């Protein structure tokens, strides 16, 4: 590790890793991972990546509209346009880099359906897409001569300097290091771990939000926290094992304690309504039945299909 870099990236999930690869070999980059990079929140993502790649059956305008509806039209339109318009080329780039998205015999990427989407536009690698993406990117990033990669290192301060930033780090050996950089990218992910129960990795503690605020950034919509509706029941465990959105995309239905479907009673989109809507439906049904027992039923699919499509969950 050097004393000065052109760019320091705080966070080693998909965003941080992919961002590191956007710089030329002449620019020095430092990527800092709070723990072993293999345990990022991105590596836990199961379902896949939404992108309009099937122009015959899908359209970017539909993807934009789906996103606006899911966000109750409080979204940032410019951010949505970037997501929708740049997403397809980024997915194709990931494939070029070596990510093996599930494909048919002809090589065409398979796309599934997920909640909030009106079309099949989710590319995936079985039910561990995040791991497939991050494992590929980690290998490439670590091979780059212009990129230094440090793991098990906690960034505790990001301060303005005359020509950039100072980054304060607590290393794995408990020593403290400070490096300077011209530019700093905060890619630290979400804040799921501040809640009692979560499917998030232990590192999702909102560090980047704090750094940005301390540097003068204006924060908004901090109440818009996304909760995943489905996880394995584990009463004594804070960490819950995620059951992918894609399971419902493949037709799984939610059942209450009486074995009855109920999601459609709260929203006509049923199990494929946006996550906040499905989560609210589960809570309201729990209050109605005075029970916290719920089931996700995919028995209409064969065991072989479930084993092949969702090997990690199985």
Question: What is each stretch, according to the model?
Answer:
Residues 7-31:
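N-terminal Rossmann-like FAD-binding beta1-loop-alpha1 element of flavoenzymes
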Residues 24-46, 55-56:
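Glycine-rich FAD pyrophosphate-binding loop
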Residues 37, 211, 217-314:
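An anion/pyrophosphate-binding glycine-rich loop and adjacent beta-alpha core
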Residues 51-83:
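Glycine-rich active-site loop/strand segments that organize a redox cofactor
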Residues 70-110:
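Rossmann-like flavin
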Residues 77-88, 121-139, 150, 198-206, ...:
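Short beta-strand to alpha-helix junction loop
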Residues 95-175, 183, 187, 231-234:
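Conserved redox-cofactor binding core of oxidoreductases
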């Amino acid at each position: 590790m050097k004393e000065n870099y052109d760019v320091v990236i705080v966070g080693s999930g998909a965003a941080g890793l992919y961002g590191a690869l956007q710089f030329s070999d002449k620019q020095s980059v430092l990527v800092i991972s709070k723990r072993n990079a293999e345990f990022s929140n991105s590596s836990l993502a199961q379902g896949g990546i939404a992108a309009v790649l099937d122009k015959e059956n899908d359209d970017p305008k539909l993807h934009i509209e789906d996103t606006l509806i899911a966000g109750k039209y409080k979204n940032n339109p410019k951010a949505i346009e970037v997501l929708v318009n740049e997403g397809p080329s980024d997915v194709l780039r990931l494939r070029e880099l070596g990510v093996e998205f599930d494909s048919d015999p002809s090589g065409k990427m398979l796309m599934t359906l997920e909640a909030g989407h009106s079309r099949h536009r989710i590319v995936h690698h079985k039910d561990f897409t995040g791991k497939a993406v991050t494992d590929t990117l980690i290998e490439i990033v670590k091979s780059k001569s212009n990129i230094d990669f440090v793991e098990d290192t906690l960034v505790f301060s990001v301060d303005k300097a005359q020509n950039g930033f100072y980054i304060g780090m607590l290393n794995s050996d408990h020593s403290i290091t400070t490096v300077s950089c011209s530019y700093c990218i905060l890619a630290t992910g979400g804040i799921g771990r501040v809640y009692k129960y979560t499917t998030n990795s232990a590192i999702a503690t909102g560090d980047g939000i704090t750094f940005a605020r301390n540097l003068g950034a204006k924060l908004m919509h901090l109440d818009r926290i996304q909760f995943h509706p489905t996880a394995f029941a584990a009463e004594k465990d804070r960490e819950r094992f995620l059951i992918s959105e894609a399971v419902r995309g493949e037709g799984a239905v939610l059942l209450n304690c009486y074995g009855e479907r109920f999601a459609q009673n709260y929203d006509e989109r049923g199990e494929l309504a946006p996550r906040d809507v499905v989560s609210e439906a589960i809570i309201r049904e729990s209050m109605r039945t005075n029970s916290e027992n719920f089931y996700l039923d995919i028995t209409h699919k064969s065991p072989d299909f479930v084993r092949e499509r969702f090997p990690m969950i199985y």
